Amino acid sequence: ETAVIAVIVGIVVIVFVRDFPEEKGGYPDNNPAFDGEKAKAEHQAALEYLKTSKWTALKCLKTGRMWVLWIAVGITGFMSMGIMSNFVTKFMVMGYELPTVLQMLGIAGVLAIPGSIVVGWLDVKIGTKKTGILINVLAFVAVLCCLTHVTVLHYISLPILAVMLGGSSNLMVSCTAAIWGRYDFKNAFSVIQPLNSVMTGVGITVVSACNSIDPTCQLAYIIMAVMAVIGLIAMCVLKVEPIDSEVR
């Protein structure tokens, strides 16, 4: 069934989705205040620019800011997948019954939907970098809550986890767009997204390895707390601004 759904979605995307709104008669950011002819001319000029853009995959991989971005935002994905893959085991070891743990997991999953919206709203209101810093701080707080044996703190960690789940992918898109612009975004994101997938996969692997060493699951959460601090430092260092004057 999943494969059938994936095929259907793929067909819909191929037929109806385009890279730019201008290709479907729309406006950048869905803003009709744009001068249509001017926007069209700028779009054509940008497409010509892309033909000679220096931001190839190799160039992106050689760029330090790409790797700082990977650490700053990728770690939230590392933690999200690490926590989710370990959630049931962790809380059952701490004395929770399986139905309660599944209920908690369901709460976090449901809240991830509005969590994504909240992250998008914060991105617009306070800026991408500040939002990224906030998410990394919250990630650290969530892990600390889970390191305790205080039930109230465990439940407090759930909406924070939801924001991490719903917002980490949003933040990667926002940061990439802010740094490489609207047109070079495609080249940069084609590099950073696979790297991000590696980070999330590593999160699951590291947590599993830690649990084989420490059945209480505390070691895994201590490591994730350290990772959260590293991610926070990277986000503070990351320049969320156009990487040069040429990107569009």
Where are these regions (language model features)?
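Symmetry-related core transmembrane helices of the 12-TM Major Facilitator Superfamily/SLC fold
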Residues: 1-15, 219-237
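Flexible cytoplasmic inter-helical loops of multi-pass small-molecule transporters
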Residues: 19-53, 244-248
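Extracytoplasmic gate region of multi-pass secondary transporters
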Residues: 58-119, 203
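Interfacial helix-cap and linker-helix signal at transmembrane-aqueous boundaries
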Residues: 91-92, 122-123, 207-215
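Small-residue-rich transmembrane alpha-helices and their cytosolic helix-loop interfaces
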Residues: 105, 109, 136, 189-197
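C-terminal transmembrane helical hairpin of 12-TM major facilitator-type secondary transporters
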Residues: 106-112, 118-119, 123-175
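A late C-terminal transmembrane helix in Major Facilitator Superfamily
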Residues: 180-214
